[in-house]
Regions:
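Core of compact, soluble alpha-helical bundle domains
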Residues: 1-131
Length: 131
């Protein structure tokens, strides 16, 4: 078993993001959705995710933007979010411990719930996200 450490730096965030997306890309259920959307722009996506989680978890404000709009039209149902959460949480649990690791899992869960409900809303109306 690996020694689990706290999430304290951008290096920890990069480890979290890189290992998580390695699992996502290999996953039979959600991997194809990510590959179709991101295509050859993985370096840019990973950099954006570093900044997002650095802002959320370390309170170092390097991410500016709206995370939801790129997800608004994805062909996903709750099962996809469950898999995303399962991969994210197990990735955290395999490598990290402590308050920030628990906060990362809590925030990921809240984000998945919010994205799921917003995606359902936009599927059932003619409205589109503002940002």
């Amino acid at each position: 078993m690996l020694d689990r450490k706290e999430i304290l730096s951008i290096e920890d965030i990069k480890l979290l993001v890189d290992t998580f997306y390695e699992k996502v890309r290999k996953d039979a259920l959600i991997g194809p959705i990510f590959e179709d959307k991101i295509q050859d722009r993985w370096p840019e996506h990973l950099e954006r995710m570093y900044r997002f989680w650095q802002t959320v978890l370390l309170e170092e404000h390097t991410y500016f933007g709206s995370p939801f709009p790129p997800h608004a039209q994805l062909p996903v149902v709750w099962e996809h979010f469950e898999r995303w959460l399962s991969l994210f949480n197990s990735n955290i649990d395999d490598q990290f411990s402590g308050k920030i690791a628990e906060e990362a899992k809590w925030r990921a869960n809240k984000m998945a719930e919010m994205f799921y409900y917003k995606i359902r809303h936009y599927r059932n109306t003619d409205a589109r996200p503002l940002f």
